[in-house]
């Protein structure tokens, strides 16, 4: 896969060090940016990084740490309730089970998919706005609903790519196949894409591929040149900083 060649170890840009911290970050990320969530969790986690510690803060106390994030009051309420359930039913551990995850307040199918994939390495697909757009534009898995796209992606994508496909598609949608101004001239799969609204630099890139001047699928370069001649690197693997994995999960609405 070209996406794997460009980014062998894709990750989310949300910062976390345990499955519980990831759960908190993903719940907070709904209708919020990853940058905003990371700023909040950098304040929160040094003070409270377990379900018991979060509950001890209370809704008002937790809200103070996350008030820079949209819908922070409802998120604080959901997180307190979810933490109580984790402590009472799961020994304060995040379950690696879809039904148990979706039973937690504030956790729906998409959030559960992120946790199962990112924390536990399961081949799930959390379809957010980026994945939905890429799947429909490229023709990889066209669908009218999130669930339809999710099911088609899992059916279409070969097994060896499924665990990482979630992050590849999100990163591609966020940095290249953007909603308003897709960077088709920098796209490493432009010649495979069925999108009729390709921006003109894609034509040059597609011609290069058809003439054999671009690497094959399995050995695609990590960068491409835009129309201006500047090299645009495809999003590299996110660095690890301070013991925390910097990852970016796609925040859409809380499921």
Question: Where do the protein language model's features map onto the residues?
Answer:
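Catalytic cores of DNA base-excision repair glycosylases
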Residues: 1-207, 235-249
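Intrinsically disordered, low-complexity terminal tails and inter-domain linkers enriched
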Residues: 208-252
């Amino acid at each position: 896969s070209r996406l794997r060649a460009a980014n062998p170890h894709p990750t989310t840009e949300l910062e976390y060090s345990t499955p519980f911290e990831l759960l908190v970050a993903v719940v907070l990320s709904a209708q919020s940016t990853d940058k905003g969530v990371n700023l909040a969790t950098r304040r929160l986690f040094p003070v409270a990084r377990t379900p018991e510690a979060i509950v001890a803060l209370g809704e008002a106390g937790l809200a103070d740490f996350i008030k820079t994030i949209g819908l922070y009051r409802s998120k604080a309420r959901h997180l307190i309730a979810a933490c109580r359930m984790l402590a009472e039913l799961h020994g304060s551990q995040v379950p690696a089970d879809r039904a148990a995850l979706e039973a937690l307040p504030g956790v729906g199918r998409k959030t559960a998919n992120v946790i199962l994939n990112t924390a536990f390495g399961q081949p799930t697909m959390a379809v957010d706005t980026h994945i939905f757009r890429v799947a429909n534009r490229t023709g990889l898995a066209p669908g009218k609903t999130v669930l339809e796209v999710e099911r088609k992606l899992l059916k279409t994508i070969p097994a060896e790519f499924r665990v990482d496909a979630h992050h590849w598609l999100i990163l591609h949608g966020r940095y290249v196949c953007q909603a308003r101004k897709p960077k088709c001239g920098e796209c490493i799969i432009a010649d495979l894409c069925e999108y009729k609204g390709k921006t003109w630099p894609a034509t040059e890139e597609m011609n290069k591929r058809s003439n054999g001047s671009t690497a094959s699928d399995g050995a695609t370069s990590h960068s491409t040149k835009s129309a201006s001649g500047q090299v645009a690197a495809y999003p590299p693997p996110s660095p690890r900083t301070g013991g925390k994995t910097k990852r970016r999960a796609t925040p859409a609405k809380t499921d």
